[in-house]
UniProtKB/Swiss-Prot annotation:
Belongs to the dicarboxylate/amino acid:cation symporter (DAACS) (TC 2.A.23) family. This is Excitatory amino acid transporter. InterPro entries: DAACS, Na-dicarboxylate_symporter, Na-dicarboxylate_symporter_CS, Na:dicarbo_symporter_sf. The lineage of its organism: Eukaryota, Metazoa, Ecdysozoa, Nematoda, Chromadorea. PANTHER family: EXCITATORY AMINO ACID TRANSPORTER (PTHR11958:SF110), SODIUM/DICARBOXYLATE SYMPORTER-RELATED (PTHR11958). GO terms for molecular function: glutamate:sodium symporter activity; L-glutamate transmembrane transporter activity; neutral L-amino acid transmembrane transporter activity. Transports L-glutamate and also L- and D-aspartate. Essential for terminating the postsynaptic action of glutamate by rapidly removing released glutamate from the synaptic cleft. Acts as a symport by cotransporting sodium. It is found in: Membrane. Residues 1-7 are cytoplasmic.
Length: 492
């Protein structure tokens, strides 16, 4: 037992930090701490988030470029197609699971809205504009700018200009705002454009792969940079248990009227948590077993550290460094697979978010007494899938993209604010499911590409041996040619 604890000390500390953080948070709620004191308690957790975020950009760049540069174009294409197929399928399964549960359990009761009160006015969101933003962010006009800003369509209320010949009725309408209209404006907002950076790095990695030996020095630079970043990550990991403890404790202390909110939204929480449990403990393991014929729960055991970190940070991108270590060191997945599949998965594969958005949208319809037709349910499933892909892998992004799903079926956007009170908990749990889905996807992709990768390694080793042998022959020939002949000896 002692030897097991010593071997898995970091995992034990991380799990203990989650339990202690929750326990201390609930115990300290009775002290009615001020927002300033709560901020002080959360500060070590804030530092952890800063450390992890600091690693994301260099890690994504070095891992993607070094991983793809060591593959040929055919292998890159195969890895990409396998990963995207897996992502689309598991997201669809998650959405269907969520919709089935919310329709069967029916957690939404119109009396809930009366108890909680009406929501605050929300923002307008267009499905088309969201799609266009996704495409704009995929191809940033400035790569440096993409490291700290992304494109987002915002809606501005515009008032028509008053002209001299306006009649009194028109002037009155202009003054009271009834002639105002909403105009879409494409703006830059703060936050790294992860999707754009990934697309750029994929292009660079594939180009380096095609250049072959010419690009050897540049490839080695990114390989070494990747190792340096992972060394820094290992140092941060030993600080993470304390940071996670403070994050969870601070978040529990921030929540007002925790008991009342939990009572009123209990069935909604049960529905979401049941869906996430079914997806993570049944659907994903079943997909893994059918595709690899291996025990999925043994594989999942090796991912426990990443799962717990996702629970603490509520961000799949921030958990990325730990997921790399779990897959490569605990489970022996080839780094060329993890370095390509995981950054893409952390950006577009959001199974937990898709399930949550489908459940939340239908729950809001139920508390408003709105019966959704089959066509509207299909619309919810499609837009939830799209919204989960468009959601940045940052805390509470799912709450923002919920607006897209509600707008698509004509539900009141302002009612999103009714479920904000419990989102801090659901966000952490669905993020941990997102991390699990990404990692299991990497395991499945590795299973199908292992033979090709091994063949590529054997070919590379043979080519290297042949090259060394040729160089030795040339060296021996040069030495032989430099020796004097018998005639030259006689002359001397």
């Amino acid at each position: 037992m002692v030897s097991w604890i010593r071997k898995n000390l970091l995992l034990v500390l991380t799990v203990s930090s989650v339990v202690l953080g929750a326990l201390c948070g609930f115990l300290l709620r009775g002290l009615q701490l001020s927002p300033q004191n709560i901020m002080y308690i959360s500060f070590p957790g804030e530092l952890l988030m800063h450390m992890l975020k600091m690693m994301i950009l260099p890690l994504i760049m070095s891992s993607l470029i070094s991983g793809l540069a060591q593959l040929d174009a055919r292998q890159s294409g195969k890895l990409g197609s396998l990963a995207v197929t897996y992502y689309m399928f598991t997201t669809a399964v998650a959405v269907v699971t969520g919709i089935f549960l919310v329709l069967v359990i029916h957690p939404g009761d119109p009396t809930i809205k009366k108890e909680i009160g009406t929501g605050t006015e929300g923002k307008t969101v267009s499905t088309v504009d969201t799609l266009l933003d996704l495409l704009r962010n995929m191809f940033p006009e400035n790569v440096v700018q993409a490291t700290f800003q992304q494109v987002q369509t915002k809606y501005i209320k515009v008032r028509p200009k008053v002209v001299k010949n306006n009649d009194s009725a028109t002037l009155a309408a202009l003054n009271n705002g009834s002639l105002d209209y909403v105009k879409a404006s494409v703006e830059y907002t703060s936050g790294m454009n992860v999707l754009g950076v990934i697309v750029f790095c994929i292009a660079i990695g594939i180009s380096l792969s095609q250049l072959g030996q010419e690009a050897h020095v540049m490839v080695q630079f990114f390989v070494i940079m990747d190792k340096v970043i992972m060394k820094l990550v290992m140092t941060v990991m030993w600080y993470s248990p304390f940071g996670i403890l403070c994050l969870i404790m601070g978040k529990i202390l921030e929540i007002h009227d925790l008991a009342d909110t939990a009572r009123m939204l209990a069935m909604y929480m049960v529905t979401v948590l049941s869906g996430l449990a079914i997806h993570s403990l049944i659907s994903l393991p079943l997909i893994f077993f059918v595709t690899t014929k291996k025990n999925p729960y043994v594989f999942m055991r090796g991912l426990f550290q990443a799962w717990i970190t996702g629970l603490g940070t509520a961000s799949s991108s921030d958990t990325l460094p730990i997921t790399y270590i779990c897959l490569e060191e605990n489970l022996g997945v080839d780094r060329r697979v993890t370095r390509f599949v995981l950054p893409v998965g952390a950006t577009i594969n959001m199974d937990g978010t898709a399930l949550y958005e489908a459940v939340a949208a239908i729950f809001i319809a139920q508390i408003n007494g709105v019966h959704l037709s089959f066509g509207q349910v299909v619309t919810v499933s499609l837009t939830a899938t799209l919204a989960s892909i468009g959601a940045a892998s940052v805390p509470s992004a799912g709450l923002v993209t919920m607006l897209l799903v509600l707008t698509a079926v004509g539900l009141p956007v302002k009612d999103v604010s009714l479920i904000v009170a419990v989102d801090w908990l659901l966000d952490r749990i669905r993020t941990s499911i997102n991390v699990l889905g990404d990692a299991m996807g990497a395991g499945i992709v590795y299973h199908y590409s292992k033979a090709d990768l091994d063949a590529h390694d054997r070919l590379a080793a043979t080519t290297r041996s042949h090259s060394i042998a040729m160089n030795d022959e040339k060296r021996q020939l040069a030495v032989y040619n430099s020796l004097p002949t018998d005639d030259e000896k006689h002359t001397h």
